[in-house]
Amino acid sequence: MNINRSVPLSKALVGTWELLTREDFTPTGERHIDSSLGADPFGLLFYDSNGNFAAQFMKRARNTSTTEIATQAAPNNSRAQGGYDAYFGTYTTDDTEGTVTQRLVGALSRENVGQVLTRAMTIAGNELVIRVHTAASSGAPIVRTLLWRRVG
């Protein structure tokens, strides 16, 4: 849902966003740390007015001296490799539902190409909140909440 009702989500979303926080919680409210990107990853997210987007995430304490095992893609999510995840493609918005559907045209992980991801989004001022229902690497359900700040 777009908090600023005078501007539809499809318009308010356009811009460059920097990740502030990324938190995963189990249905019982327990915090879960994603080992592939860590508790506090870097991230940039871009949406243009023509329906194109790009997303990049990197583990803040990325260790270049060892090989990190790639994680499995979870439902409604992509797959990180070596502490990094990136994908791009096209998007559509549902201003009434407050959701964005992303179609992955390219991705770091081949198996993510063609994937369709739907995200619940809320924009208030220069902050974007994305909520994703997905699963931990163990398969247990989690809700991921990402807080972004507009930087462009």
Residue ranges and their predicted role:
Residues 1-152:
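Lipid interaction determinants
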